[in-house]
């Protein structure tokens, strides 16, 4: 992640005494200190400067302790562990003048920590963010999992390309599901994003980048995902399934329609379909048929069910969920 360099001036609250850019501004009055995390690590020296023209009678405190850490317009601290992070405030005469929140981003053995989000391991290991699109409109949804329930905040940024980024607007992050996994509870968060100038029929040359900032208490982590819309397409299931018995035959004619959410015109944005008839027993062999049409003739026995799913006809992205209807 590319971080904006802090501008050092008399009104800045925090600046770094190291040339290695180990501190950067996440948002107003919130700073991330990047630390190599190993025993006896030296940490990072940070100098805090009070945002005031006053020079005398200034004191510093950390969080709500009230303990005076030092006096003067500046305070130099050595940040080594989470006990050194938190909200630093400068005061004069009982009045708070300015403050800054320091968060820690850990790096162990050259790898940034990934303690907040759960590895979903699909489609591969170290998959923390998953994204899907129902069509080629430039709208997509991303989600992630965590077992943490409190003191947790997320923010999301997205763009197409990184060197000359094009706009993608993301909404608010929401808690979309809660599940019990053994002895643990799992929380799913999601966000919906829309490419500002999407052209559904155009060839994608640059990938979309999604960046999630995660803060748990005083710990900061970031997670990224890069993809083309065509790679994350997953249509909604086909709709309006209907069965029509054929006279003097064990067969039925089944028909369905494209999902409402799929891109149009369908002559250009075409789907292919997989159909199957499932008997009452789940162990019973299922015969699957692939077709580009929206109807088929099958044998549909009593107590069985007919199912159909859809996939982009010209690109091997994900299949939709199944849509089903009973045979009788």
From Swiss-Prot:
Q: Which UniProt keywords apply?
A: Cytokine, Disulfide bond, Glycoprotein, Immunoglobulin domain, Secreted, Signal
What's the domain of life for this entry? Answer: Eukaryota
Q: Please tell me whether the keyword Glycoprotein is annotated for this protein.
A: yes
Pfam families assigned to the protein according to its UniProt record, in alphabetical order: IL12p40_C
What is the role of the protein in this entry? Cytokine that can act as a growth factor for activated T and NK cells, enhance the lytic activity of NK/lymphokine-activated killer cells, and stimulate the production of IFN-gamma by resting PBMC. Associates with IL23A to form the IL-23 interleukin, a heterodimeric cytokine which functions in innate and adaptive immunity. IL-23 may constitute with IL-17 an acute response to infection in peripheral tissues. IL-23 binds to a heterodimeric receptor complex composed of IL12RB1 and IL23R, activates the Jak-Stat signaling cascade, stimulates memory rather than naive T-cells and promotes production of pro-inflammatory cytokines. IL-23 induces autoimmune inflammation and thus may be responsible for autoimmune inflammatory diseases and may be important for tumorigenesis.
Which organism does this sequence originate in?
Macaca mulatta (Rhesus macaque)
Q: Where in the cell is it found?
A: Secreted
**GO biological process: any one?**
interleukin-12-mediated signaling pathway
Provide one Gene Ontology cellular component: interleukin-12 complex
Under Gene Ontology molecular function, one entry of this record is:
cytokine receptor activity
Q: Which family does it belong to?
A: Belongs to the IL-12B family.
Occurrences of domain Ig-like C2-type (ranges): 29-106
User: Mind telling me what this protein is named?
Assistant: Interleukin-12 subunit beta
Under Gene3D superfamilies, the record lists: Immunoglobulins
Q: Which SMART domains match?
A: IGc2
Predominant subcellular localization, coarse grouping: secreted
GN (gene name): IL12B
Q: Describe the protein's quaternary organization and the partners it interacts with.
A: Heterodimer with IL12A; disulfide-linked. The heterodimer is known as interleukin IL-12. Heterodimer with IL23A; disulfide-linked. The heterodimer is known as interleukin IL-23. Also secreted as a monomer. Interacts with NBR1; this interaction promotes IL-12 secretion.
Q: Which sites does the entry annotate for glycosylation? A: 125, 135, 222
Q: Which residues form the signal peptide?
A: 1-22
Where is each Fibronectin type-III domain found? 237-328
Q: Which cysteines are joined by disulfide bonds?
A: 50-90
């Amino acid at each position: 992640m590319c971080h904006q360099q802090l501008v050092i001036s008399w009104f800045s609250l925090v600046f770094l005494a190291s040339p290695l850019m180990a501190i950067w501004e996440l948002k107003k009055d919130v700073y991330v200190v990047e630390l190599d995390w190993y025993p006896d690590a030296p940490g990072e020296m940070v100098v805090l400067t009070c945002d005031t023209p006053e020079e005398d009678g200034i004191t510093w405190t950390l969080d709500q302790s009230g303990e005076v850490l030092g006096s003067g317009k500046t305070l130099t601290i050595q940040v080594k562990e989470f006990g050194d992070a938190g909200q630093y405030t400068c005061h004069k005469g009982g009045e708070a003048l300015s403050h800054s929140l320091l968060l820690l981003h850990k790096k162990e053995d050259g790898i940034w920590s990934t303690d907040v989000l759960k590895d979903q391991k699909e489609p591969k290991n170290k998959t923390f963010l998953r994204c899907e699109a129902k069509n080629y409109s430039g709208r997509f949804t991303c989600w992630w999992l965590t077992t943490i329930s409190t003191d947790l905040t997320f923010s999301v940024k997205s763009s197409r390309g990184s060197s000359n980024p094009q706009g993608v607007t993301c909404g608010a992050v929401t808690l979309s599901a809660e599940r019990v996994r053994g002895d643990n509870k799992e929380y799913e968060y999601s966000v919906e994003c829309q490419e500002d100038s999407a052209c559904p029929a155009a060839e994608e040359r640059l990938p979309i980048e999604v960046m999630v900032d995660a803060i748990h208490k005083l710990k900061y982590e970031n997670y990224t995902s890069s993809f083309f819309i065509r790679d994350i397409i997953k249509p909604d299931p086909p709709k309006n399934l209907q069965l029509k018995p054929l006279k003097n035959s064990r067969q039925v004619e089944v028909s369905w329609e494209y999902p409402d959410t799929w891109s149009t015109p369908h002559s250009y944005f075409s789907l292919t379909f997989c159909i199957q008839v499932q008997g009452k027993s789940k162990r019973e062999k299922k015969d699957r048929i692939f077709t580009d049409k929206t109807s088929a003739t099958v044998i549909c026995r009593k107590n069985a069910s007919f199912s159909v799913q859809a996939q982009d006809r010209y690109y091997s992205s994900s299949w939709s969920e199944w849509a089903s209807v009973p045979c009788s």
